[in-house]
């Protein structure tokens, strides 16, 4: 089967491309810039198209002969772009790919949204019908594209929406890198109680879900939260990262609000200069917002059963960070 993966060089995209190739599919990966990762995808056997999802001619060419689209490409919390950029890529780009997919006779369209559309979960765990309260333009525009995707659902082209939790694992130095690096230093300051919930999602588990909904009749027209079996408190997560690294870690508790104020000040100062602030509000919110989800719908309807548990995933991630000298 010929499959298009947009955002093919991203953390999730790259892992999905490899899985689909290993499963015997013919894969086209679309991404907006050339680099080491695109060369790696070519070595694996994927066709690579360098273009934005807003480039109609390039996407039309990439989608020719494709049966299934996995739409993963997104503008993800870019510091030095206007908010209209999120609208252009996450909503406009999605519309462009949808329209071209329908015109090309694509029979399945899988849209990768985010659990972040639910914002701070008031009564954890949240299911798919919990309130939609996005906290930033990334989350807002990812949600705005969801009804757009549903509007293209038809007998000819089935759609599926996945809302992944906090993705981590070997192959990505950023998402959990901060946690591992601080633990490696032996001290992880916790601002606030440390008792808010956080819901990890190991990369292989997410790829299993994406591979499942590639198949006809799996999840047609549905929206699914995708996360690991277990959600944990921030403090417990830090402790288990330390265990995975075979390290001792101190977790001193500090007041939250001074950090929150500093985050807003740094963002205001750094944004006009187009530099990344050392602290910013989204990262500060990690210490105070609940992120915990009910995955029972995905378990029942698409057969999603996370194969890799938290401790196993953390150990594998720790080994990769150490091998790649990120710690």
Indicate where each model-derived feature is located.
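N-terminal Rossmann NAD(P)H-binding glycine-rich loop of SDR-like oxidoreductase domains
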Residues: 3-23
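NAD(P)H-binding glycine-rich loop region in Rossmannoid oxidoreductase-like domains
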Residues: 42, 46-92, 100, 115-120
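Conserved Rossmann-fold NAD(P)-dependent oxidoreductase catalytic core, especially the SDR/UDP-sugar
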Residues: 95-138, 160
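Flexible, glycine-rich beta-alpha linker
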Residues: 119, 157-177
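Active-site Tyr-X1-5-Lys
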Residues: 135-160
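Substrate-positioning beta->alpha
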Residues: 144, 172-178, 192-214, 221-222, ...
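Mid/C-terminal beta-alpha module of Rossmann-like enzyme folds, strongest
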Residues: 216-278, 295, 311, 315-316
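Amphipathic terminal alpha-helices
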Residues: 297-300, 305, 309-327
């Amino acid at each position: 089967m010929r499959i298009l993966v947009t955002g093919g060089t991203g953390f999730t995209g790259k892992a999905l491309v490899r899985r689909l190739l290993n499963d015997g599919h013919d894969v086209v990966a679309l991404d907006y810039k050339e680099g080491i990762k695109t060369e790696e995808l070519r070595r694996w056997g994927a066709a690579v198209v360098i273009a934005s999802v807003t480039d109609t001619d390039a996407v039309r060419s990439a989608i020719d002969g494709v049966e299934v689209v996995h739409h993963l490409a997104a503008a993800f919390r870019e510091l030095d772009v206007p908010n209209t950029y999120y609208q252009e890529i996450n909503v406009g780009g999605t519309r462009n790919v949808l329209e071209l997919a329908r015109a090309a006779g694509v029979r399945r369209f899988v849209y990768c949204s985010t659990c972040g559309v639910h914002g701070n979960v008031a009564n954890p765990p949240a299911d798919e019908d919990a309130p939609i309260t996005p906290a930033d333009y990334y989350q807002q525009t990812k949600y705005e594209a969801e009804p757009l995707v549903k509007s293209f659902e038809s007998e000819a082209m089935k759609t599926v929406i996945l809302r992944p939790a906090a993705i981590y694992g070997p192959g990505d130095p950023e998402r959990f890198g901060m946690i591992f690096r601080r633990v490696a230093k032996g001290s992880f300051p916790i601002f606030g109680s440390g008792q808010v919930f956080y819901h990890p999602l190991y990369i292989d588990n997410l790829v299993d879900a994406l591979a499942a909904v590639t198949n006809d009749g799996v999840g047609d027209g549905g929206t699914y939260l995708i996360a690991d079996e277990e959600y944990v408190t921030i403090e417990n997560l830090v402790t288990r990262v330390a265990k995975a690294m075979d390290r001792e870690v101190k977790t001193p508790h500090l007041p939250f609000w001074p950090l929150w104020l500093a985050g807003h000040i740094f963002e205001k100062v750094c944004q006009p200069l187009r530099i990344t602030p050392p602290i910013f509000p989204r990262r500060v919110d990690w210490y105070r917002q609940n992120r915990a989800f009910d995955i029972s719908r995905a378990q029942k309807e698409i057969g999603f059963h996370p194969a890799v548990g938290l401790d196993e995933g953390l150990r594998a991630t720790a080994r990769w960070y150490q091998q790649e000298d990120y710690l």
